[in-house]
């Protein structure tokens, strides 16, 4: 029995960007709590490996290929989930372009790259929510967690802009869907030690960032799990429209 007892038993969760990194850890944690998990990723081989690992530990998982920037692909993800598990209770919008991201200024970034980047990193959360919310409502409601970032409060060019958009999207959708008992919140991690981060952020920049964090270290993907599970759980049943920093104290607001 997991931390939340049998609360997640017989529930169905979709985690996008779950073929590795933070999304993988979210998917594995939900499976350990008893949820059936759809491991959704544009890299279907990575998703299948994660799903196989979950099933190897006695969990229930399905790998699904999804391009979150494509409305039809998001709808197909929802359809495959319904066909396999019969419903949808939770969605974690984690998919993003980050590893290998082109660092550039807003005034000079290639326009086609910018549009693709925003279609995944911001619009993807909207398209996946649109694909699943009616299915959640049919089950009496549900919960959605969006992945934001402390980059929303720092200068981070178009990556930070996308996360500002995620924060606004979280609050607007939570307001629209609250009447259907669908709660939507966001987690804003600080710098997390993942392969994607190691290939994108120069290490001297990482060292400077860590100097400004009260807990004096980068986060680990596992540091985000507690907040994700809490926000999906019934313990958070009166919490919606909120952005929660999980960042070692990097950003503090009064």
Task: Tell where the protein language model's regions lie, with residue ranges.
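Substrate-binding pocket helix/loop in short-chain dehydrogenase/reductase
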Residues: 102-106, 110-115, 158, 209
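Active-site helix of classical SDR
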Residues: 129, 162-165, 170
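Short C-terminal tail/terminal secondary-structure segment
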Residues: 2-4, 98, 102-103, 154, ...
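Alpha-helical segment proximal to the catalytic Tyr-Lys
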Residues: 134, 175-179, 237
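Canonical Rossmann dinucleotide-binding motif of NAD(H)/NADP(H)-dependent dehydrogenases/reductases
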Residues: 6-38
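Catalytic Tyr-X3-Lys loop
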Residues: 107-126, 141, 145, 166
């Amino acid at each position: 029995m997991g931390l939340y007892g049998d609360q997640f038993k017989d529930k169905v969760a979709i985690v996008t960007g779950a073929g590795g990194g933070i999304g993988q850890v979210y998917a594995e944690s939900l499976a350990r709590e008893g949820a059936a998990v759809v491991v959704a990723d544009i890299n279907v081989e990575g998703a299948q490996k994660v799903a196989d690992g979950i099933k190897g530990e006695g969990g229930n998982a399905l790998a699904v290929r999804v391009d979150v920037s494509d409305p039809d692909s998001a709808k197909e993800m929802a359809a495959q989930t319904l066909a396999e598990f019969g419903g949808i209770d939770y969605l974690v919008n984690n998919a993003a372009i980050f590893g290998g991201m082109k660092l550039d200024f807003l005034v000079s970034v290639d326009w086609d790259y910018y549009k693709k980047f925003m279609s995944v990193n911001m619009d993807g959360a909207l398209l996946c929510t649109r694909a699943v919310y009616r299915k959640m409502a049919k089950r009496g409601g549900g919960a959605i967690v969006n992945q934001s970032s402390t980059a929303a409060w720092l200068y981070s060019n178009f990556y930070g802009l996308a996360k500002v958009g995620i924060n606004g999207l979280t609050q607007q959708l939570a307001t629209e869907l609250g009447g259907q008992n669908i709660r939507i919140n966001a987690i804003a991690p600080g710098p997390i030690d993942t392969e994607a981060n190691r290939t994108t952020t120069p290490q001297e920049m990482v060292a400077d960032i860590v100097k400004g964090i009260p807990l004096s270290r980068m986060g680990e993907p596992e540091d985000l799990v507690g907040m994700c599970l809490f926000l999906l759980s019934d313990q958070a049943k009166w919490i919606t429209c909120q952005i929660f920093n999980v960042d070692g104290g990097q950003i503090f607001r009064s």
